[in-house]
Amino acid sequence: MSRDATLPVRGRVAELKLDKKLPKNIDAVVVALFTGEGDSPQLAGGNQLNAIFTNKQQSAILRQLEAVGAKGKANEITRVPGVEDVAPVVAVGLGSAEELDDEKLRRATGTVARSLSGFENVATTIGELGLSAAVTGFGLGSYSFKGLRRAGDDAAEEGVDKPLTVHFIGGDKDEFVAAQITVDAVVLARDLVNTPSSHLYPESYAVIAANEASRYGLKTEILDENQLATDGFGGILAVGNGSSRKPRLLRLTWKHRKASKHVALVGKGVTFDTGGISLKPGANMDNMISDMGGSAAMIATIIAAARLNLKVNITATIPMAENMPSGDAFRPGDVITHYGGLTSEILNTDAEGRLILADAMALASKDNPDYLIDAATLTGAQLVSLGLRTSGVMGTDEFRDTVATTGRSVGEQAWAMPLPEELDEEIKSPVADLRNVTNSRFAGMAAAGRYLQEFVGEGIEWAHVDIAGPAYNTASPYGYTPKRATGQPVRTFIQVLQDIAER
């Protein structure tokens, strides 16, 4: 594996620019509409809108929009040709002006961004309604991932080979740049998750991620299978032993000289999960390329923190393994010893994520951080209880609630879940300290959280985020969220770190 390894292919997003005035040679101007009285649309905006369009031009645009039935309803897209020496207009509805918030603006701009195939240069005044939200929506909504199809293949998505530039007219430069960094972070997480396991496996993943982090001055360290064995990382080794592509542990470190707090990030990095000896059904197993979504989120988050120069020390600990059945695979009935000495009885090899997280969380706890956040596509029970779009957040009460509330505030749905004490009896083993699953079909998400709690150091504020559903969208695109990798919950974690840094 070359030390210079990079992702074999990256997704494409629009180039976002901040301009003081309307550039020349614009293909279209994107405007926003509110729903007015009697369902008649109203142009949304003020100074920026007036800087581009005269009152006469605005009236002509509204007449055209009304003529083709535009109402200004949320996420409604309407196109009209240019009038009064104005470029063609693409209008997106925002609904009621009184009910507009950042998430509605993100979803609307994401929706319109997905509709701009075939355009090369567009300008927009929507930034004056909320620049950060608009940049996020346009950036993430414009994302496309061609994958490894050959150039010029007829199967390529329409417009994917025609780059789009979006010009925001006016706004604060610092806010614009910070929003771009967040977009870049989500895109990196999406690209990592979308990369097939043939190309992203523990060894390559560790090198690719380390190279990405090194570009922004982060300290990197990679432990191979021999070092993992020497240091006693029994969970990572057990899960990865069935594969010919051996496990790795990646450590990334960001330090700020004025920081007073230390945050540990841990992300599940199972680059492909067959279930091991407890083999998964074949249907939809291809989606298991996403089983490293938690690790991708943490890698992207710590890089964004460095780029934003956040005044907080951060260490990301990323266990990476491929869970495969073979003559060398771990088995139900095995007992493994984790980093730090706790032992686990294996009842199901498809509950592997918590085993590698346990090692990583025990190591992260040795650094005595103030906060520990882990993220993982961990349980099917998360999908059953909260669905495809809402993460389950567990942990110490106050910090758990903070992370869940922050997620909702940035538009990444999250809900605080309990860790009932009675589950402790169900994760006890007669032959080890713990068992990796219970004998009950109930409370699977909480039981996994209760298991992980055993590996969190005393006095550490902790949040465990189960993203089994939200990390990978198997349904249709919506708002600024594409099909396949979503990049959740990167924006949540960036905001949590910003809040900690500013205290």
From Swiss-Prot:
Its cofactor is Mn(2+). Keywords: Aminopeptidase, Cytoplasm, Hydrolase, Manganese, Metal-binding, Protease. It holds the Pfam family Peptidase_M17_N. Its main location: cytoplasm. Binds 2 manganese ions per subunit. Its EC number is 3.4.11.1, 3.4.11.10. One of its GO terms (biological process) is proteolysis. InterPro entries: Leucine_aapep/pepB, Macro_dom-like, Peptidase_M17_C, Peptidase_M17_leu_NH2_pept, Peptidase_M17_N. It is an enzyme of class 3 (hydrolase). Mn(2+) 2 binds at K268, D273, D291, E352. Coiled coil: none annotated. It is found in: Cytoplasm. Belongs to the peptidase M17 family. HAMAP family: Cytosol_peptidase_M17 (MF_00181). This is Probable cytosol aminopeptidase. The lineage of its organism: Bacteria, Bacillati, Actinomycetota, Actinomycetes, Mycobacteriales.
